[in-house]
Amino acid sequence: MYKIGDKLRPKARCFAAIVYIVTAKVYNDWYQETIYTIEQIGFGKHIIDGITEDALNKDYVKIK
């Protein structure tokens, strides 16, 4: 499990990376099964494609 932002950034500091988020943790026992794509470019700045604000507010994501 990776925290959004904290552990994704180091992979993107020197090069562009595409990360597939498989599962977003939602509330107690309910999970939203969705595939998201994050494109990260340079210095920890990310460009995000296909992710809603609601998904970004979740605490953890699983990266495949």
Identify the residue ranges that each predicted region occupies.
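Short beta-strand-centered aromatic/proline hotspots
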Residues: 16-27
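Short, solvent-exposed secondary-structure boundary/capping segments
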Residues: 29-38
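Intrinsically disordered, low-complexity, charged/polar segments
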Residues: 37-64
